[in-house]
């Protein structure tokens, strides 16, 4: 089984009702209940593999097909979603500074990613119990990629896993040690920034790091004997493959404030014809630093600002 976090890139465009930004504000439980009602009343659905897209999904799907594994997406809006599930296209995230973030909606009491998962778990909108899901599917090996935000969201689920289930997990991600239960720290595989170094044939962004690492690891598992190997055997296998790889040369870029990034985008809008990826490339080639997910949100803010200034509809 391969598990990856959801991204906001989707092939199908969500209707207004299925965007979190249009939900009423309230307590975290009220927001979760309202979200569940909207999802359950949606009349249009697609196979999950017709909705999710982007390089992280493509890399994970490639890995799943290569080893005939079930591919599962951890969704902040729907729980655990396998690729044969029928789901509506939607827009909801636990990432802050996003127009469809749950953080914009919870105005009563406090909120956090794990609290949101717990609130959704009390509804009938999807599957949220990791332990039950692993029990029903009984995978021999579980390859999991998590970002820090998603690790925070499913922390309690991971903490409840029995030792026999933990022994099946191989965890892929950068800087997760402080965001996962102590029982899973040992499960972290030795993949790091060498995946973007000069010796890697599959370089990419931080966003697709985990999926690229899983694909690399799957290629090392060339037979069933390796698939059923122990955690220590698998870590040695991966480290052996990476041992001669060099770290990438880190460019010396200046980190800009949010306001400076927005100003850069606004000033250079016509130079790249308003293209997001071209704009990020231009910003970085100009000696500036900005993480991809952060840039995406700031790009949308700058776009809205430009539309307002020009008197165009949002």
Where are these regions (language model features)?
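A structured, charge-rich N-terminal accessory region that forms the first stable segment of a protein
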Residues: 1-50
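A structural signal for short, well-ordered beta-strand segments and their strand-loop junctions
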Residues: 2-4, 70-75, 82-83, 143-145, ...
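Long, charge-dense
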Residues: 77-130
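A charged, amphipathic interaction segment
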Residues: 125-197, 256, 262-266, 273
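Glycine-rich, aromatic-bearing surface loops/beta-hairpins
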Residues: 167-240
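Basic, amphipathic alpha-helix used for nucleic-acid engagement in HTH/winged-helix/SANT-Myb modules
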Residues: 220-263, 308-314
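Positively charged, polyanion-binding regions of nucleic-acid-associated proteins
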Residues: 252-274, 286, 299-307
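DNA-recognition alpha helix
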Residues: 276-288
């Amino acid at each position: 089984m391969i598990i990856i976090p959801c991204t906001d890139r989707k092939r199908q465009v969500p209707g207004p009702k299925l965007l979190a930004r249009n939900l009423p504000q309230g307590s975290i439980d009220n927001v979760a209940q309202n979200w569940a009602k909207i999802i359950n009343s949606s009349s249009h659905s697609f196979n999950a593999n017709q909705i999710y897209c982007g390089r992280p999904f493509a890399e994970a799907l490639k890995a799943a097909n290569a080893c005939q594994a079930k591919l599962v997406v951890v969704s902040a809006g729907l729980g655990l979603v396998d690729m044969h599930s029928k789901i509506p296209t939607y827009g909801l995230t636990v990432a802050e500074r996003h127009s469809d973030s749950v953080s914009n909606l919870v105005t009563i009491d406090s909120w956090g990613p794990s609290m949101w998962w717990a609130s959704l778990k009390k509804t009938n909108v999807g599957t949220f119990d990791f332990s039950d899901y692993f029990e029903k599917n009984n995978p021999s090996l579980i390859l999991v990629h998590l970002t820090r935000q998603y690790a925070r969201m499913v922390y309690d689920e991971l903490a409840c896993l029995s030792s026999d289930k933990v022994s099946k997990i191989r965890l892929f991600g950068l800087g997760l040690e402080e965001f996962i239960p102590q029982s899973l720290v040992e499960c972290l595989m030795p993949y790091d920034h060498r995946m973007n170094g000069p010796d890697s044939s599959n370089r990419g962004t931080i966003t697709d790091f985990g999926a690229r690492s899983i694909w690399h690891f799957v290629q090392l598992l060339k037979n069933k004997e390796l698939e059923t190997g122990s955690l220590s055997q698998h870590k040695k296998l991966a480290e052996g493959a990476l041992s001669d790889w060099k770290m990438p040369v880190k460019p010396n870029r200046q980190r800009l404030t949010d306001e400076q990034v927005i100003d850069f985008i606004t000033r250079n809008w016509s130079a790249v014809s308003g293209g997001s990826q071209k704009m990020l490339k231009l910003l970085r080639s100009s000696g500036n630093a900005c993480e991809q997910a952060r840039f995406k949100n700031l790009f949308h803010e700058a776009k809205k600002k430009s539309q307002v200034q020009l008197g165009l509809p949002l």
